[in-house]
């Protein structure tokens, strides 16, 4: 994850990856984790996602981490929330408001406590292959024993399109989360009318995974 790349995306408001509403995958498949209200939730590379609101309605503690300070400030400003802000270092800030705890800074160094549940819709696929193993090592360290992950990935021929978002095929998911129980909940194949297929991709699929420690 090149910091400058994502900082520029937010600074210029080129955020096509941001959804204006709750992701339907979250609402459809979160129950597969058998979540409980008192279980803590971690959302890596959270942006200013509406998914955070949906999760906070169902859990007492939702923690996120986001590289872009612009995104974190926008999350609270757009909801008219006034968070408590703590400067942890020259490059890391902590924003807290009710159920929300969001770190503004580097995912790899933010002091995030292990959570019961993790939701990764757009984090793993945002990273190039050479960064994904380290990312998952850190992610696994932030999951409690008995914890569960809801993971969303994409599968396409990486030679046909430059990411992000990047393709993370099934064999890589299996390798990254080796030793954990991995269940594919959905594979949604794009049809001929899908924008990615119209742009020339030979295949494009979105996959949803339940990963249990």
UniProtKB/Swiss-Prot annotation:
Keywords: Cytoplasm, Methyltransferase, S-adenosyl-L-methionine, Transferase. The keyword Methyltransferase applies. GO terms for molecular function: thiopurine S-methyltransferase activity. PROSITE patterns: SAM_MT_TPMT (PS51585). The gene is tpm. It catalyses: S-adenosyl-L-methionine + a thiopurine = S-adenosyl-L-homocysteine + a thiopurine S-methylether. S-adenosyl-L-methionine binds at residues 10, 45, 66, 121. Belongs to the class I-like SAM-binding methyltransferase superfamily. TPMT family. GO terms for biological process: methylation; response to metal ion. SUPFAM superfamilies: S-adenosyl-L-methionine-dependent methyltransferases (SSF53335). GO terms for cellular component: cytoplasm. InterPro entries: SAM-dependent_MTases_sf (IPR029063), Thiopur_S-MeTfrase_Se/Te_detox (IPR022474), Thiopurine_S-MeTrfase (IPR025835), TPMT (IPR008854). Its main location: cytoplasm. This is Thiopurine S-methyltransferase. Gene3D superfamilies: Vaccinia Virus protein VP39. It is found in: Cytoplasm. Pfam families: TPMT. Its EC number is 2.1.1.67. It comes from Aliivibrio fischeri (strain ATCC 700601 / ES114).
């Amino acid at each position: 994850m090149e910091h400058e790349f994502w900082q520029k995306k937010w600074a210029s408001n080129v955020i096509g990856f941001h959804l204006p509403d709750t992701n339907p995958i979250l609402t459809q498949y979160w129950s597969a984790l058998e979540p409980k209200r008192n279980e803590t939730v971690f959302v890596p590379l959270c942006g200013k996602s509406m998914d955070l609101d949906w999760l906070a309605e169902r859990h007492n503690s939702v923690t996120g981490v986001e590289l872009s300070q612009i995104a974190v400030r926008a999350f609270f400003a757009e909801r008219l929330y006034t968070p408590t802000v703590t400067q942890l270092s020259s490059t890391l800030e902590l924003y807290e408001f009710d159920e929300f705890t969001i770190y503004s800074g580097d995912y790899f160094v933010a002091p995030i406590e292990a959570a019961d549940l993790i939701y990764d819709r757009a984090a793993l696929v945002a990273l190039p292959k050479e960064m994904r193993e380290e990312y998952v090592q850190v992610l696994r360290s932030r999951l409690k024993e008995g914890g569960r992950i809801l993971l969303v990935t994409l599968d396409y021929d990486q030679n046909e399109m430059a990411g992000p978002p990047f393709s993370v095929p099934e064999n890589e998911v299996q390798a990254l989360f080796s030793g954990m129980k991995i269940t594919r909940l959905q594979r949604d194949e794009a049809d001929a009318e899908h924008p990615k297929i119209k742009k020339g991709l030979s295949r494009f699929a979105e996959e949803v995974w339940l990963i249990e420690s």
